Each structure stands twice: as C-alpha cells, then as structure tokens.
UniProtKB/Swiss-Prot annotation:
Name of the protein in its database record: 4-hydroxythreonine-4-phosphate dehydrogenase
Subcellular location: Cytoplasm
Gene source species: Cupriavidus pinatubonensis (strain JMP 134 / LMG 1197)
Pfam families, alphabetized: PdxA (PF04166)
One Gene Ontology term, aspect cellular component: cytoplasm
Residues bound to a divalent metal cation: 174, 219, 274
The protein's required cofactors: Zn(2+); Mg(2+); Co(2+)
UniProt cross-references to InterPro entries, sorted A to Z: PdxA, PdxA_fam
Entry superkingdom: Bacteria
Length: 347
C-alpha cells in the first residue's frame, strides 16, 4: 500500500471561519480518504479552543491522536477572538502560507514534504493593515513560486449532470470592467490556454482537454457589430492555440454557453473576466465549489467563499466547500502520483 498523501491545510484568518471549516471538514472526512494525511497549519491552542466552541473537542482530539490529522503549530501574535480582526495577526496568516509553500517545494533533489496545499480564506485587509502589501492568495503564491503567470479556475458539480464537473477559468481576474478589453490580448490568451491545457493533463489526468472560450462582447461581438475583440484578438489566439495542439473552441456568446448541452463535453470554460465566468458557476455550485490555482509548480486548492467573520465560532458555518477543496487536492495529487486512472477517454 502506498504511503499516505500528505496535504498541507492553512487555516486562514484566525478571527474568521477558517479554523471552523477546517475542523468540521476533517471530522466529516474521517476515514474517507485512507490514503491521505492532513497536516494542519495553525495555532494549536486556537484550534483546540475553536473545536471546544463548536462542541467537537473530543472528536478533534481523537483525530489527532489517531494520526490522520497532524497539527503544525504556528503561534498567533496575539490572542484571537472569533469575529474580531487584529492586524497584529496579519503576519501569522502569511507564516502559515510560507510553511505550506516551503513544504510543497522540492529542495536539493529531495521530494516535497506535502503533495498539495489547501487554503482557508484570509482577510486581505488585516494583512495590508499589518503593513504587508497583499492582493490575495493567488498573487502571493505566484510570487513565492517565481512563476510569471497563474490562472484562477473554479470548479463545482454541474447542476444538470451530477457526475460531471463544471470548470471555469478566467483570462483576467480582479480588474475594473473598463480595463478588461485592453487587458485581453493574444499573448495573454495563448499563455492562459497553455496553462489550462497543461494542468488539466498534469493534475486531472485528462488526455486531451477540450476548452470552450467565451467572447468578450454581447453575442460574441455579433460579427463585429458589437465590438471587434473577438475578430481581432480572441479568434487569432484560438487559431494559434490550435496550431500548438490545444483543443480550444470559440468564441461563444457567454449568455448561452453555460447550458448543459454545451457543457456536456467540455473540460473547462475560459471566460474573459471575473463576473462573466463566476456568476453562472457560483449560481449552480456555491458552497460546494473549489478555487484552484493553475500554473504553479504545486497543487493549491481553496474554498469558494470568504472569512464570514459573523459566523466564526458559532457552529453555523458550512464546510462543504472545504470538503470539496480537500477532496480535489487528494484527487489531483493522486493523478500527479499516478494513483488514478485517466479521468476521461481521449477525444
């Protein structure tokens, strides 16, 4: 039997629901992933206190004693109360991320300690208030890994096909809408499609990914009458991608692309901007979606929601998205280690 896959889980903003959903997810997953061991990064006292507040202290202690959950103590700067932010704990959040990143990297030929990392939500404002410029997990991980570009992809079960996944990647992420058209260029789309194609093969075991690409304008530009980005940028980028062996199709009108009959044979949809792609995905999958960063040299998954400060310590936080993030990380690591068969028959 192979050694258990070691997953790093950073517990996120200590005043938010990160500790709650980590504890809840790992208790619900008890015994379900016998080939995984969960390395939880965070303040051990905070986690024990939060488990007690949730009424699951004994179950949490048992998971640790059984060895399926391993606590890596990262000390808080100051004591934390659920729901109350403290900028002094901003560096604590980054310390957890740094430990997870270090564990996912190979060193001097030695294998990585962790097969993947899963991140609970962080409060960007707290980190910035601590004097550390921080725009988000994705950008921080890309800089730490030394890669020029990463791609945000969210995934969740297709509402009309319970056994099929809807994956939506973004050409641009956190940009004002007025800046999107200028940001969408042929080189950007080519690089984005290359990353998607490579990581769907590497992490998901898909032999020949099929990528459907949205237009930028209403009705995909209506043959140039509602904008020419489709003609001047997107179509040339898709042609070059196909010449490079990438199965990229489109551009399709975004308002009709997200239908079961179009998505049935798609491995991923590439949307041009944030709300164009994530609004339909979250409508159908919110609370069970997974945020996946493509283009990194290691696997990173996360939840599809924020810190929910008002729910911290209350026992009311849903941990479904954290469960799916953990399961996705296990599956992706399994593909990377050759422990799973290909997810689909080649086209």
């Amino acid at each position: 039997m192979p050694d258990p896959l070691a997953l790093a889980i950073s517990t996120g903003e200590p005043a938010g629901i990160g500790p709650d959903i980590t504890i809840g997810a790992l208790l619900q997953l008890a015994g379900q992933n016998g080939h995984a061991r969960y390395h939880v990064l965070g303040d051990a006292h905070l986690l024990a206190s939060r488990a007690a507040a949730l009424g699951v202290a004994h179950a949490w202690e048992r998971r640790i004693a059984e060895g399926e959950v391993v606590i890596h103590h990262v000390p808080l700067a100051v004591a934390c109360e659920p729901g109350r932010l403290d900028a002094r704990n901003g560096p604590y959040v980054l310390s957890m991320l740094d430990a997870a990143i270090a564990g996912c990297r190979t060193h001097a030929g030695a294998p990585a300690r962790f097969a993947a990392m899963v991140t609970a939500p962080v409060q960007k404002s707290t980190i910035n208030d601590a004097g550390v410029p921080f725009t988000g997990h994705t950008e921080y991980l890309a800089e730490a890994a030394g890669v020029p570009r990463v791609v945000m992809m969210l995934a969740g079960p297709q509402p009309a096909h319970a056994n099929a996944m809807l994956r939506v990647a973004l050409a641009t992420t956190h940009l004002p809408l007025r800046a999107v058209a200028d940001a969408v260029t042929v080189p950007l789309l080519l690089e984005t499609l290359s990353i998607i194609d490579a990581d769907l093969r590497r992490w998901f075991g898909i032999a020949r990914p099929r990528i459907l690409v949205t237009g930028l304008n209403p009705h995909a530009g209506e043959s140039g009458h509602m904008g020419r980005e489709e003609i001047n940028v997107i179509e040339p980028a898709l042609a070059q991608a196909r010449d490079a062996g990438i199965d990229a199709r489109g551009p399709y009108p975004a308002d009709t692309l997200f239908q079961p009959r179009h998505l049935r044979d798609a491995d991923c949809v590439l949307a041009m901007y944030h709300d164009q792609g994530l609004a339909p995905l979250k409508y159908g999958t919110f609370g069970h979606g997974v945020n996946i960063t493509l283009g990194l040299p290691f696997i990173r998954t996360s939840v599809d929601h924020g810190t929910a400060l008002d729910l911290a310590g209350s026992g009311q936080a849903e941990h479904g998205s954290m469960i799916e993030a953990i399961r996705s990380a296990v599956t992706m690591a399994g593909h990377a280690n050759g422990r799973h068969a290909s997810a689909r028959v080649p086209h």
